[in-house]
Amino acid sequence: MTRSGQLRGLVAIDLDGTLLRDDKSVADADARAIVDAVERGLAVTLATGRLITGTLPTARKLGLVTPLICADGGLLIDAATGAALERRAISIAHAATAIEALVAHGLLPYVFSADALHCDSAGAVHRSIVDTWSREIVVHPSLMHAEGWRHPEGIALTVGLGNRVAVGRASEHLRQAHAGTFDTVHFNLGQSPVWAVRSLPHGCDKGDMLMRLAARLGLPGTRVAAIGDWFNDLGMFAAAGRSFAMGQAPDAVRKVATDHLAATSATGGGVAEAIGKLLADWT
């Protein structure tokens, strides 16, 4: 997993808001730091909410070889081929239940398979918003009745888009009525008036898959580090022995991190800052 062949530790890096700056570029300092980390014995992975197709381009540009964590911990994939190595999935029946709930609350429903995003024609209006997760968007006449996303292995997650009030109500319903099936959260999408409610398989988060990856590599939690900026990074912050919060991270996220970074998603450089500390401390 490293060019030196001797593994000193594992570093998991969030994409949007951490490695990727606000303009979706990678700072030169961060790219160089990742190369240096690999050459000096660290396994580097990406841990993101994006799907396979939204993750692989960045991983390939950086030359990463360690398996990648996608769909907020729902998938562990081969960095070269994109093949799923491990997955946590929502069954087709449960996905249909989620879609029904989203539609009942007046939201536009989306289903995320491992490598594509599925919606109907109304949902396609928000293509510029949802293509952060994946640029592979499949539009169906009716999402509920479409067969294209109904694969035996299930789906990665469901999302509903709408206004703040409707999203909040849908989120509350899913958390109250289906707590044993889904882990549901809702949030604003950037500075837009659009809000999202997202449901993952119950118990699924980045931290769980990160520790599964560490076990594959034969590394203890004390030799695992995570770099992130948002609430979906809290699971891996809790699991990792060392955690780094970006400068723009909310106070609730920074509070649980072991280290606070000065760099932000506007400046870039947070990954380089964190890797520098790890290389100094992990002798």
Where are these predicted regions, by residue range?
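Asp-based phosphoryl-transfer active-site loop
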Residues: 7-23, 98, 237
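Surface-exposed amphipathic alpha-helices with a cationic face
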Residues: 31-39, 103, 175, 211-215, ...
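Conserved acidic, metal-coordinating active-site core of Asp-based
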Residues: 112-227, 231-233
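Mg2+-dependent phosphoryl-transfer enzymes with acidic/Ser/Thr/Gly-rich catalytic loops
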Residues: 2-10, 26-27, 199-283
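Active-site phosphate-binding/coordination module
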Residues: 25-132
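Short, structured coil segments at secondary-structure junctions
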Residues: 62-64, 71-72, 178-180, 239-240, ...
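Hydrophobic packing residues within well-ordered alpha-helices of enzyme cores
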Residues: 30, 55-59, 170, 174, ...
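Non-catalytic pre-domain segments flanking phosphatase-related domains
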Residues: 1-13, 39, 61
